[in-house]
Regions:
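Sensor-1/coupling segment of RecA-like P-loop NTPase cores
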Residues: 1-25
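Non-catalytic, well-ordered alpha-helical scaffold segments
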Residues: 11, 66, 76-80, 84, ...
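Short, flexible helix/strand-to-coil boundary loops that buttress conserved ligand/catalytic motifs
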Residues: 20-21, 49, 83, 177, ...
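Short glycine/proline- and charge-enriched loop/turn segments
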Residues: 24-32
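Conserved AAA+ ATPase "SRH/arginine-finger" region at the nucleotide-binding site
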Residues: 33-44
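Amphipathic alpha-helical "lid/sensor" segments that cap RecA-like P-loop NTPase cores
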Residues: 46, 50-115, 125
Length: 195
């Protein structure tokens, strides 16, 4: 038994978190107060990255941090992944400039290619097809529109909906404000490159 104890459950898999706490079939149903966290401010990242690089005798251009922050819309995991790679690419007493970003991006995608292929291997053909279409368009509004379906040679609105359902459930694709996108920025770029 616990008294005067608070628990914090956190995670970026929104579907899973919602299911745990807001599904009547789950034991934690309506037992929490939900709070969404907003992105850490860009200035905080600029200061933090500059300090971390400097502590190890390296430097990073403020503009490089701004570019990375905007690429990932303030999403911490992706920013940290990119900053870690940029740090590894930067020699001691050197300055990491925006030119390093493409190299870091390519390195991350190459390092994760096996994971991306495993995801694709586990998808049905129609799921792959809709995933490729989303990757090409990046942010998709009107995913069941005839224009989107024709442009990507998809079968029908109902087949798009059927293929999309498991992609959403597994957080491979997310819907933000009526726009669909691939959740993992690196996976999205990988798909756009190869297909």
């Amino acid at each position: 038994q616990c008294s005067r104890t608070s628990f914090i459950f956190c995670g970026s898999k929104r579907h899973m978190m919602t299911d745990i706490f807001y599904s009547p079939a789950k034991p934690f149903f309506q037992s929490v107060i939900s709070q969404s966290l907003h992105p850490i401010p860009m200035e905080t990242y600029i200061e933090f990255a500059g300090r971390m690089f400097a502590e190890r005798g390296k430097f990073i251009d403020k503009f490089a941090v701004e570019i990375v922050y905007k690429m990932f819309e303030g999403c911490t995991w992706y920013i940290q992944m990119m900053m870690n790679e940029l740090f590894a690419l930067t020699e001691k007493d050197m300055i990491c400039t925006p030119e390093y970003i493409d190299i870091a991006w390519d390195n991350i995608i190459m390092a994760q290619e096996d994971r991306f292929l495993a995801i694709l291997h586990n998808l049905a053909p129609k799921q792959k097809q809709i995933l490729m279409a989303i990757a090409k368009d990046r942010n998709v509004e009107g995913i069941t529109s005839s224009e989107f379906i024709k442009r990507h040679n998809l079968v029908s609105a109902s087949s798009v909906q059927a293929a999309l359902k498991p992609l959403l459930k597994n957080d491979i694709v997310i819907n933000e404000d009526g726009k669909y996108r691939i959740y993992d920025y690196f996976f999205a770029d990988y798909l756009a490159r190869i297909y």
